[in-house]
Regions:
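Glycine-rich SAM-binding Motif I of class I
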Residues: 22-23, 44
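Conserved class I S-adenosyl-L-methionine
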Residues: 9-20
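Short, glycine-/aromatic-enriched active-site segment of Class I SAM-dependent methyltransferases
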Residues: 111-128
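Conserved S-adenosyl-L-methionine
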Residues: 27-35
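Glycine-rich helix-loop-beta junction characteristic of Rossmann-like nucleotide cofactor-binding loops
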Residues: 3-10, 72-73
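A short glycine-rich, Lys/Arg-flanked "PGG" loop and its adjoining helix->strand segment in the class I
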Residues: 89-106
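S-adenosyl-L-methionine
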Residues: 35-90
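Flexible, glycine-/basic-rich loop-and-beta segments that form/coincide
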Residues: 165, 169-192
Length: 192
């Protein structure tokens, strides 16, 4: 998230989609988020200290695709997502529906869950930069279809567990469509 200096966390009501053990939830709280709704399809994974924090609402056993405003309560200012085994394209409508019109979205694009099994290399790694680029474009275009344009793209400095190169997208309503030159630059300076 530090790649996107325009994303303000302090005092914001945040949603951590795919919270798991709470990596993003912890980052948000350390940056003084007002509240974090931690959502995961699993159960009991969120670190105990985060689970006990009064600034955190835990929604375990919750499929992001079925998330509603009633479930999260007050609308969300900042959405972060780090999802596995599901394409972001499938959850964008639900994430957009529970957020405020001026909300920011910082999504981790994991090409291994976007390109389809038939395009994965050995060990589930997407090695072809063209496939990684196509994955980011597909997510950004799906976001644009629900009204979210792209303000920033950054390669994650840490590869995924199997060695996959992953990317962050910064999205907001009213922002332009994806800038392919910005994407090419993120791919060029990111891990290969």
């Amino acid at each position: 998230m530090s790649a996107f200096t325009g994303v303000i966390v302090e005092g914001k009501r945040c949603l951590d989609a795919g919270a798991s053990t709470g990596g993003f939830t912890d980052v948000l709280l350390r940056r003084n988020a007002g509240h974090v709704v931690a959502v995961d399809v699993g159960y009991g994974q969120l670190a105990w200290g985060l689970r006990q924090d009064e600034r955190v609402t835990v929604l375990d056993r919750t499929n992001i695709r079925h998330l509603t405003g009633d479930m999260v309560g007050e609308a969300i200012d900042l959405v972060v997502a780090d999802l596995s085994f599901i394409s972001l394209t499938l959850v964008l409508p639900a994430l957009a529906a529970v957020s405020k019109p001026e909300a920011d979205f910082v999504l981790m694009v994991k090409p291994q869950f976007e390109v389809g099994r038939e395009k994965l290399g050995a060990g589930g790694v997407v090695r072809d930069p063209a496939l990684r680029k196509a994955a980011v474009i597909e997510v950004a275009e799906s976001a644009y279809d629900v009204g979210l344009g792209t303000l920033g793209i950054a390669a994650s400095s840490l590869p995924g567990p199997a060695g996959n190169v992953e990317y962050f997208l910064w999205l907001r309503r009213g922002a332009p469509e994806i800038d392919h030159a910005m994407l090419d630059e993120a791919i060029a300076i990111g891990p290969q």
